[in-house]
């Protein structure tokens, strides 16, 4: 059964049910906010704030929007948008686009243990525009325990091997 929501102006909007293929990913739904830090051999270490929103349309994918800002002065740093799919109950595909001219397809296992959900993904394809920096591989490990989301991101770029780049802890601010 679909839920109905009324917005100002008496516009009725039907909110679809989460697609059955996404049952395992449902704990991601909502908006998450928190802090992280980054490092890489070619840049100075930095701290950032982050907001991530996972949504759905009733189709067999989650929508994903991510934004980061510098912790010291709030200037925009990075953004990503994409889709998360679970073609099988124990496997995830994450399709991402970056405004820096990079696209990623990452795949990997999805495990659930009680209220803990874990994904360990590695890029199977990286697309680059002609002007984008060289990125050869990206890996993400994400864990959701209750209302806490933690992740690490590894990257191979500009001639460097796959290594730690980012880590963050976020908390659910809305479902």
From Swiss-Prot:
E.C. number(s) listed in UniProt:
5.99.-.-
* Cofactor note text: Binds 1 heme b group per subunit, that coordinates a highly solvent-exposed Fe(III) atom.
Indicate whether Transmembrane appears among the record's keywords: no
UniProt key word Iron: yes
Indicate the quaternary assembly: Homodimer.
| Record motif GXWXGXG, residues | 30-36
Q: According to its UniProt record, which reaction does this protein catalyse?
A: peroxynitrite = nitrate
Positions with a binding annotation for heme b: 165
Q: Domain remarks in the entry? A: Forms a 10-stranded antiparallel beta-barrel structure able to accommodate a hydrophobic ligand in its interior. In fact, this fold hosts the heme group, which is located in a wide surface cleft.
Q: Specify the species.
A: Mycobacterium sp. (strain JLS)
Which HAMAP family does the entry link to?
A: nitrobindin
Q: Which family does it belong to?
A: Belongs to the nitrobindin family.
What SUPFAM superfamilies is this protein classified in?
Lipocalins
| Family matches, as InterPro entries | Calycin (IPR012674), Nb(III)_bact/plant (IPR022939), Nitrobindin (IPR045165), PeroxynitIsom (IPR054873), THAP4-like_heme-bd (IPR014878)
Q: Which pathway does the protein contribute to?
A: Nitrogen metabolism
What is the protein's given name?
Peroxynitrite isomerase 1
Q: What does this protein do?
A: Heme-binding protein able to scavenge peroxynitrite and to protect free L-tyrosine against peroxynitrite-mediated nitration, by acting as a peroxynitrite isomerase that converts peroxynitrite to nitrate. Therefore, this protein likely plays a role in peroxynitrite sensing and in the detoxification of reactive nitrogen and oxygen species (RNS and ROS, respectively). Is able to bind nitric oxide (NO) in vitro, but may act as a sensor of peroxynitrite levels in vivo.
The molecular function terms of the Gene Ontology recorded here are: heme binding; metal ion binding; peroxynitrite isomerase activity
For activity, the cofactor(s) needed are:
heme b
Name the UniProt key words of this record, in alphabetical order.
Answer: Heme, Iron, Isomerase, Metal-binding
Pfam families membership: THAP4_heme-bd (PF08768)
């Amino acid at each position: 059964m679909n839920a109905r929501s009324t917005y100002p102006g008496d516009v009725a909007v039907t909110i679809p049910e989460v697609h059955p293929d996404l049952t395992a990913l449902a704990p991601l739904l909502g908006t998450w906010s928190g802090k992280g830090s980054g490092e890489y051999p070619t840049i100075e270490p930095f701290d950032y704030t982050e907001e991530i929103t996972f949504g759905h349309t009733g189709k067999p994918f989650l929508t994903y929007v991510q934004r980061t800002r510098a912790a010291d002065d709030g200037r925009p740093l990075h953004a990503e948008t994409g889709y998360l799919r679970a073609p099988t109950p124990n496997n995830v595909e994450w399709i991402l686009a970056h405004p820096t001219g990079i696209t990623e397809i990452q795949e990997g296992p999805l495990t659930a243990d009680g209220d803990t959900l874990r994904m360990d993904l590695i890029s199977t394809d990286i697309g680059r525009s002609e002007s984008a920096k060289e990125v050869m591989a990206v890996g993400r490990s994400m864990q959701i325990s209750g209302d806490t989301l933690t992740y690490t991101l590894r990257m191979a770029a500009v001639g460097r091997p796959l290594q730690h780049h980012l880590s963050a802890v976020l908390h659910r601010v809305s479902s």
